[in-house]
Amino acid sequence: MKNKTGKKVLYYAILAILLGVFCFSGYQIYSYYSEQNASTSLNEEIVREYTIRKTGEAKEYFEVDFDQLRQQNEDVTAWLYLPDSVINYPVLQHGDNDYYLTRQIDGSYNKNGSIFMDYRNASDFSDRNTIIYGHHM
């Protein structure tokens, strides 16, 4: 009888642990996708508000209103765009490379962070090499 009670307790303890792991994993997955969605939405809003699409002789291009964009965040230094891809982001630069690892352009926390330039580089791209970081974009 004692052996059956011990097995039952062990069974429920393992079940509770597995249920806890399942719930924690579900929360982590939800958190990841929620932040990814927030990051994507903010970037789409920035692109919509601060860029103007134009067509030229050979290709479609756009202009960025840096003056208005810098009113929102003075750390904006450039815009990174690759045609026919999803890469279309403002490039930020701060005195600490860790700052934009987990922050959006509006300063809000987000695990995805932002595209940012190394703090040691000149913001006018006059260096021989410029390092640009981007994580989970």
Regions found by a protein language model. Give the residues of each.
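N-terminal Sec-pathway targeting helices
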Residues: 2-18
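Solvent-exposed, non-transmembrane regions of membrane-associated and secreted proteins
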Residues: 18-137
